[in-house]
C-alpha cells in the first residue's frame, strides 16, 4: 500500500531511469544536424578522434552522446536504418551494464550497435553473445559494414573453427559468437601449453542477446570439457536388459519396483525393486550369488543400473533427444535445437545409446568445467537484451547484479491475448486447435502454432496434413530451412508449426518478407538495371497488397498447444505477434493431460469440471483458471531458481579454486624459467618431510630417523646419513638438519642440470609443472564431483551440507597442492635427462582428445538418482520429518518452506 503510494508520488525506479535517459537522448538529437553535415570521411574519422580523447583521460560516459550520434548517422548511411529514440535509451542501459527488456520487433540487433561501438573504442574488445552460430554469423554479416565504415574490425567465433581463425576473430574490435563457444574457449585457453596457443584476450565487455535464455535457462547446465576414461562399454549393453524386467509403480506407494518422480526428474527404486534388481543381475552374471548391490565392490553396478533406469523412464526419443546417423543427439529443452557434439554426463548418455541400440561411446572424465554464472561474471562489464526479462528481474539482480530496465515500445502494443481454454482430454484440445487454425486459414490470417517438443510439433503437423491444411514445420530437425520458414511465416493464410521460438532471432513480417526476393533480383546478372528496378517495384507492390490483407485479417495469430513450465517462454511465443504496433492475437489451448497441469493443477481443475457437469468438447475459459496455471508456473520457476542458486553456491567454492589454479597456470605459461618455483617446491616438500619424521618441539627419542632416511632414499634418490650426523654432532637441532638436507638436494639437482644443460632442464621443469598441475586438477575435479554427490546426506547428521562442502573442498584443495609439489619434486629428483630429445619426447605439444559436454541440468548439484531430500525418498526410508522442523538439506529453512514444499 505504502510502496504503491510512493511510486505514484516519485515514480518507479524504471521511470526515473527513463527520465534520465531521455535527457541524454535530447543531447544526442541536438547533435544530429551537425553529424548529417559531415562527409563520410569526416564521420568515419570521428572514431580516431574519440580514441585520442580517451587516451587523454576522457571517460566513455563523456563520449556517449557524441559517439551515439555518430553511430546513428553512420547506420542511416550504411544500413539505411536510423535508431529511434527508444533504441537510444536501450543502448544507454546496455552501456551502463544493465539488461534492456525490449519487445520483439523493436530492433534489438540495431540497439546493440550503440554500446558496442562506444565500448570498442577502448581497444579491449567487445563480445556480442548470441544463442547459436547462425545468429552470430547473420548479425555479424549485417552489422560488419557499419562497423567497418567506422574503422572497427569485426570477427565471428564459430564452433569447429580452426585455431588461427579463432585467434583472428578474438583479435578484432568486436567479436560475435555463442555463449557456449566463448565459455569453452575460456576453458580451452586454460589447458594450453603455450601462451601463443591462447585465443581469448581480456574479458572486458559482453552484450548478451536473448540474455534470459543464456543466463537463466542454461545456467543450470555447466560447461564441461571432458576426455575419455577407461570404462566398460559392455556393462551398458548388459544393463540395458534390466529396466524392461522391472515393474513401474502406478502410484508412489503402489506395487512395483520403481517410482518415477516427474517433478524432481528422478527415479527411485523401492525395497522390492532392490531385491528384484539383485535377482536379475545375479541371473545375468553381473552380481555374485548372495552379494548385495550396496557392497563396496558393486558401487559401479548401482551407478549403471540407475543410469539405465533413468534412460528408460525419463528420457524419451524426439523429446529429449533424436537418433541421427547412428548417434544420440540431445535436443535443447529451451530452444528445441539439436545440440550436436554435446553429451549428458554420469553415464546417462551411454545408457541412452544402449537403449537405442546405437554404438556406445566411452564414459568421460572431466578435464575442466565452469557454469555460465561464473563465466559471465568474469567480464569487467556485462549487459543483455531480451523481450522477456521482467519476470526474472530478481534473479538477474541477485545472481549477476544486473538491473533490468523495461524500455518502452516505439508504438503502442495492440495484440489481443485471450484467456486460456482448458479441455478434459488431449483429443478435445487438438480438435479445438484444428478448428481455430482452419478458421484463420480460411480468413487469410497467418498462424504460428507453438509446441514444447519435437514430438508435439510432429503430432500437430500430422493432424494438419490429415485436414489437408498446407503448413511448414519448424523444429530442430528442420535446422537448415529455419530462417526461410520464419521469414515467410507472416504471409496470408500461412500456417507454421514451431517448437520453442526462443532465440529464433528473425522477425515475422506481416505479408512475408520481400527482401530475399529483392536480393535475388539484384544478384541476377542476366537482368538490366531497368528490368531489376521494375521487378523490385512489382515485388514491393505485391508485398503491400499481402501486408494489407494480413492486417485486415487481424495480423499474426499465435496458438499455444500447451503451457511451458516458464511463463517467460510463453511470453516469448506471444511476443512473435504484435511487433511495432501491428495487430495480432494469441490463445493457449490446454488439457488435463498436459505435463504442467497433470503434475500441478489437474485435480483442482477436474473437480471444477465435474461440479459444472461439463459435456465433452466444452472448455473452461476463466481468468481464475489462467491465474491458477500461472501460479503453478511460478512454483516451477521458483524451484528452478532455487536449483540455480544452489548450483551457484556450490560452484562458487570450485570457482575460487579454479581462479587460483588458472592464475598459477598462466604465470607458469608466461615464464620461460620456473626454477624459482621448483626451488620453493623442493624446499617445501623437504621441510614437510622433516616435520613429519622429526616433529617440532619433540624429544630426540621421538624422532624417526630411519623413516626419514628411507623416504629420502626411495622417493628422491637422496642418501642422507642423518643418524650419523647426530652421532657425530649431538647438539645438531632440527633446523640445521633441515638446511643440510635442503642443501644436499640442491647440490644433487644441480648435478643433473649440469649434465643435461641449463636450457634443457628449464624447459623440462616448465613442462613438468604444467602437466602435474593439469593431472592433479583433473583428479581433484573428480574428487569434488564425488564429494558433491553425497554431501546432502550430512543433513541427517544435523550438519550444514554447504558448510561441510566448503570445509572438505578446502581440505581436498590443500591436499591437491601438496600432491602437486611432491609429484614435481619426486620426478625432478629421480628422472634421468640426457638431452633435448628426452624433453621433446615427454613434452605435450597439443591438447588431449576431448569433447564439450552438455551436463544434465542440476547434475552439478549432485542430484543423484536417490535424492534423499525428496518427500518420497524420506518416506521410503521410514523417516518422518515434521513440517516445522529444519530441512535436512541444510538451507536453514523449515522443511515445509524448502523441500517439503515440493510434496
Curated annotation (Swiss-Prot):
Cofactor binding mode and count: May bind 1 zinc ion per subunit.
Main location as per UniProt: membrane
Domain of life assignment: Bacteria
Enzyme class, spelled out: translocase
Keywords carried by this UniProt record: ATP-binding, Cell inner membrane, Cell membrane, Cytoplasm, Membrane, Metal-binding, Nucleotide-binding, Protein transport, Translocase, Translocation, Transport, Zinc
GO cellular component: cell envelope Sec protein transport complex; cytosol; plasma membrane
Residue positions binding ATP: 87, 105-109, 507
Gene Ontology MF: a single term: protein-exporting ATPase activity
GO term, biological process aspect, one: intracellular protein transmembrane transport
Obligatory cofactor(s): Zn(2+)
Binding site for Zn(2+): 887, 889, 898-899
Family: Belongs to the SecA family.
Name of the protein this chain belongs to: Protein translocase subunit SecA
Organism per entry: Chromobacterium violaceum (strain ATCC 12472 / DSM 30191 / JCM 1249 / CCUG 213 / NBRC 12614 / NCIMB 9131 / NCTC 9757 / MK)
Phylogenetic lineage: Bacteria, Pseudomonadati, Pseudomonadota, Betaproteobacteria, Neisseriales
Amino acid at each position: 500500500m505504502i510502496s504503491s503510494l510512493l511510486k505514484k508520488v516519485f515514480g518507479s525506479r524504471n521511470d526515473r531511469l527513463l527520465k534520465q535517459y531521455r535527457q541524454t537522448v535530447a543531447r544526442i538529437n541536438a547533435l544530429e544536424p551537425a553529424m548529417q553535415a559531415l562527409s563520410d570521411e569526416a564521420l568515419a574519422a570521428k572514431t580516431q578522434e574519440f580514441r585520442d580523447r580517451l587516451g587523454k583521460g576522457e571517460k566513455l560516459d563523456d563520449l556517449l552522446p557524441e559517439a551515439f550520434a555518430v553511430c546513428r548517422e553512420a547506420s542511416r548511411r550504411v544500413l539505411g536504418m536510423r535508431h529511434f529514440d527508444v533504441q537510444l535509451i536501450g543502448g544507454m542501459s546496455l552501456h551502463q551494464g544493465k539488461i534492456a527488456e525490449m519487445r520483439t520487433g523493436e530492433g534489438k540487433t540495431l540497439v546493440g550497435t550503440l554500446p558496442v561501438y562506444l565500448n570498442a573504442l577502448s581497444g579491449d574488445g567487445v563480445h556480442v553473445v548470441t544463442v547459436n552460430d547462425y545468429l552470430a554469423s547473420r548479425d555479424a554479416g549485417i552489422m560488419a559494414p557499419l562497423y567497418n565504415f567506422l574503422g572497427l574490425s569485426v570477427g565471428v567465433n564459430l564452433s569447429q573453427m580452426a585455431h588461427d581463425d579463432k585467434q583472428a576473430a578474438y583479435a578484432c574490435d568486436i567479436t560475435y559468437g555463442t555463449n557456449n563457444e566463448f565459455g569453452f574457449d575460456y576453458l580451452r585457453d586454460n589447458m594450453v601449453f603455450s601462451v601463443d596457443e591462447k585465443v581469448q584476450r581480456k574479458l572486458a565487455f559482453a552484450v548478451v542477446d536473448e540474455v534470459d535464455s543464456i543466463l537463466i535457462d542454461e545456467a543450470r547446465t555447466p560447461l564441461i570439457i571432458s576426455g575419455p576414461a577407461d570404462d566398460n562399454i559392455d556393462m551398458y549393453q548388459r544393463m540395458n536388459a534390466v529396466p524392461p524386467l522391472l515393474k513401474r509403480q502406478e502410484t508412489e506407494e503402489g506395487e512395483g519396483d520403481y517410482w518415477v518422480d516427474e517433478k524432481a526428474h528422478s527415479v527411485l527404486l523401492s525395497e522390492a525393486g532392490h531385491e528384484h534388481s539383485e535377482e536379475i543381475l545375479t541371473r545375468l552374471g553381473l552380481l555374485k550369488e548372495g552379494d548385495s548391490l550396496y557392497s563396496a565392490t558393486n558401487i559401479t553396478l548401482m551407478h549403471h543400473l540407475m543410469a539405465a533406469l533413468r534412460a528408460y523412464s525419463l528420457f524419451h526419443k524426439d523429446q529429449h533427444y533424436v537418433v541421427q546417423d547412428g548417434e544420440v543427439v540431445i535436443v535443447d529443452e529451451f530452444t528445441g535445437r539439436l545440440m550436436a557434439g554435446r553429451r549428458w554426463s554420469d553415464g546417462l548418455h551411454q545408457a541412452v545409446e544402449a537403449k537405442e541400440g546405437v554404438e556406445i561411446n566411452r564414459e568421460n572424465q572431466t578435464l575442466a568445467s565452469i557454469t555460465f554464472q561464473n563465466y559471465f561474471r568474469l567480464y569487467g562489464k556485462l549487459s543483455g537484451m531480451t523481450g522477456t526479462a521482467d519476470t526474472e528481474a530478481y534473479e538477474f539482480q541477485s545472481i549477476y547484479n544486473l538491473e533490468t530496465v523495461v524500455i518502452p515500445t516505439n508504438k503502442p502494443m495492440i495484440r489481443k491475448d485471450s484467456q486460456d481454454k482448458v479441455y478434459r482430454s488431449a483429443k478435445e484440445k487438438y480438435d479445438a486447435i484444428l478448428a481455430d487454425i482452419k478458421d484463420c486459414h480460411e480468413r487469410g490470417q497467418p498462424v504460428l502454432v507453438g509446441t514444447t517438443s519435437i514430438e508435439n510439433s510432429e503430432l500437430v503437423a500430422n493432424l494438419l496434413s490429415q485436414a489437408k491444411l498446407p503448413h511448414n514445420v519448424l523444429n530442430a530437425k528442420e535446422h537448415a530451412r529455419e530462417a526461410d520458414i520464419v521469414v515467410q511465416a507472416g504471409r496470408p493464410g500461412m500456417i507454421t508449426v514451431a517448437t520453442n521460438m526462443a532465440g529464433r532471432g528473425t522477425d515475422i513480417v506481416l505479408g512475408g518478407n520481400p527482401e530475399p526476393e529483392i536480393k535475388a533480383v539484384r544478384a541476377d546478372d542476366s537482368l538490366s538495371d531497368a528490368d531489376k528496378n521494375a521487378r523490385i517495384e512489382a515485388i514491393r507492390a505485391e508485398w503491400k497488397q499481402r501486408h494489407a490483407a494480413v492486417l485486415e485479417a487481424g495480423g499474426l495469430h499465435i496458438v499455444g498447444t500447451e503451457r511451458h513450465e516458464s511463463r517467460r517462454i510463453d511470453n516469448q511465443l506471444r511476443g512473435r505477434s504484435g511487433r511495432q504496433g501491428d495487430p495480432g492475437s494469441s490463445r493457449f489451448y490446454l488439457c488435463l493431460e498436459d505435463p504442467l497441469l497433470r503434475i500441478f493443477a489437474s485435480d483442482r481443475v477436474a473437480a471444477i469440471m465435474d461440479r459444472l457437469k461439463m459435456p465433452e468438447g466444452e472448455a473452461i475459459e476463466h481468468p481464475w483458471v489462467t491465474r491458477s496455471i500461472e501460479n503453478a508456473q511460478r512454483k516451477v520457476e521458483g524451484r528452478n531458481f532455487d536449483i540455480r542458486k544452489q548450483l551457484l553456491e556450490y560452484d562458487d567454492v570450485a570457482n575460487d579454486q579454479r581462479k587460483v589454479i588458472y592464475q598459477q597456470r598462466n604465470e607458469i605459461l608466461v615464464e620461460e624459467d620456473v626454477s624459482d618455483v621448483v626451488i620453493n617446491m623442493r624446499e617445501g616438500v623437504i621441510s614437510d618431510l622433516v616435520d613429519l619424521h622429526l616433529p617440532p618441539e619433540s624429544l630426540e627419542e621421538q624422532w624417526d630417523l630411519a623413516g626419514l632416511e628411507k623416504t629420502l632414499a626411495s622417493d628422491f634418490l637422496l642418501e642422507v646419513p642423518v643418524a650419523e650426523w647426530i652421532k657425530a654432532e649431538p647438539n645438531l637441532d632440527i633446523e640445521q638438519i633441515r638446511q643440510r638436507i635442503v642443501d644436499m638436494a640442491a647440490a644433487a639437482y644441480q648435478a643433473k642440470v649440469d649434465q643435461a644443460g641449463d636450457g634443457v632442464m628449464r624447459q623440462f621443469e616448465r613442462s613438468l609443472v604444467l602437466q602435474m598441475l593439469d593431472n592433479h586438477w583433473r583428479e581433484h575435479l573428480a574428487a569434488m564431483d564425488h564429494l558433491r554427490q553425497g554431501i546432502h546426506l550430512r543433513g541427517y547428521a544435523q550438519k550444514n551440507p554447504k558448510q561441510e562442502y566448503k570445509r572438505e573442498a578446502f581440505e581436498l584443495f590443500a591436499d591437491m597442492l601438496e600432491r602437486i609439489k611432491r609429484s614435481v619434486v619426486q620426478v625432478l629428483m629421480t628422472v634421468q635427462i640426457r638431452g633435448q630429445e628426452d624433453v621433446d619426447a615427454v613434452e605435450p605439444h597439443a591438447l588431449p582428445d576431448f569433447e564439450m559436454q552438455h551436463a544434465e541440468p542440476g547434475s552439478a548439484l549432485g542430484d543423484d538418482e536417490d535424492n534423499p531430500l525428496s518427500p518420497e525418498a524420506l518416506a521410503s526410508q521410514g523417516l518422518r520429518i515434521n513440517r516445522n522442523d529444519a530441512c535436512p538439506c541444510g538451507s536453514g529453512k523449515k522443511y515445509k518452506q524448502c523441500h517439503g514444499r515440493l510434496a
